[in-house]
Amino acid sequence: MQPHHPKVLIVDDDPVHLEIYGLLMKQAGYEALLTLAKFSGAEIPKNEYIGLVLLDFRLNSVKTAPQYAQEIRSLYPSVPIIVLSDLWALPADIAPFVSGFVRKGEPAKLLETVSRFFAAPAAKSEKSPSFS
């Protein structure tokens, strides 16, 4: 059974950014699932109904954002991944794995982008396969 509110997975190495983006998503009516990408890495949740992923590009973690994007893509093949960054454009090394790019510090643009992906006809939450 899918959740009532679309679920957004947020991956960032900064706990403050996680809380800010989580609050922003909750205020917009989405359920936020926060994942801290620590230096030692982050455990991407499995067996969750994920509708969209927000992924920070500059991570102080053992894995890079493109590596996390590949992992997320393998778990949730059709779920959109939006990169968040203070860079001016989407970096080429992550482009093949993601669906969009939003500069940090633009909450209205972020909400517009998230809303657009959830409004798309093919948009649905996807649950990763069970791992035993």
Which role does the model predict for each range below?
Residues 1-9, 15, 106-132:
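Non-catalytic signal-transmission and effector/linker regions of two-component phosphorelay proteins
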